Amino acid sequence: MSKWLIDPEVDTIDFDFTWLPHYEPQYKFVFKQGVVYDGGNEGIKYMNYPIPKVTYKHRPPLDIVYVSNGEVGEEDRYSRLQTLAGRSVKWVRGVAGRENALREAARISDTSWFILFPAKLWADEHFDFNYQPPNKALPQHYIFYARNPVNGLEYGHQAAVCYNRELVLDTHDYGLDFTMSKPHTVVPIISGVAQYNSDLMMTWRTAFREAVKLTAAGDAESLERLRVWLSEGRGPYCAWSVIGAEDGVEYYDNVDGAHEELMKTFEWSWLEQHFESIHPNFSKTSS
């Protein structure tokens, strides 16, 4: 007789409990997010048996958290997100420092993973707001894609991220990219349009910081993306997107990539001061 072990966090729905293992009957099997885990005498281990279209459980939806800090249009993007998600969306607002805002988002989340939408992201209506991490046994973050309306790039910059709650709270040492400083997986699904070009300062600082990160990464894919940031632009404030990227590369070169100098780019106040020092004749709100 087969015995079934059911995760207490899982609500089973319409699963055929008369199913019997037919690959290796001496083993037990655990279904989890479309793959099978072998639960034999040596303990559970991953077995990549193809089991398509198995509907066996329902997990409660993950918390969705929206993070903003006074961005132009934040109210509209929050309203859209809540409408598309079809449920309440938690809102972290006005917390200084991206890493502090991420920790606050993790703190208020009641689920072990949560999906974070940054304030600049205009949520895509086709995004799966009921997304679940494919392997909850491995603590990592899942980075979606966002579409850049200025230069057409599509990758994880300014995209939604499915964060592991405990991993966020336990992250104290990190590099230029808080999220990528810990185990992560890229999920090439568009989560929205990154509307970072809503005003001059937001456009410039977003491009500046991303250019610093891409320059620091230095791999072929990052450098190709940097080339696009430096050369392509359309729509509102597109010139300041290119200028911001150019200024970011110049700053990286001027400080010889020194880590402590690059980490200053985390702070909005520093970015505004740096902008004023290199563009004294331009107002942060001019066009």
Model-derived regions: residue spans:
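N-terminal anchoring/stem segment of glycosyltransferases
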Residues: K3, V10-T12, H22-E24, K28-I108
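Short aromatic/hydrophobic "clamp" motif used to bind/position activated sugar donors
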Residues: L5, F114
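A short, conserved beta-strand element in the Rossmann-like catalytic core
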Residues: E9-I13, L121-D124
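Catalytic-site signature of metal-activated, phosphate-bearing donor transferases
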Residues: V10-Y56, Y131-S287
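Short glycine-/acidic-enriched loop or helix-start segments at secondary-structure transitions
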Residues: F15-D16, D76, E125-D128
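Short, glycine/charged-enriched secondary-structure capping and boundary segments
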Residues: S79-L81, F129-Q132
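Extended, charge-rich low-complexity interaction segments
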Residues: F117-N130, L176
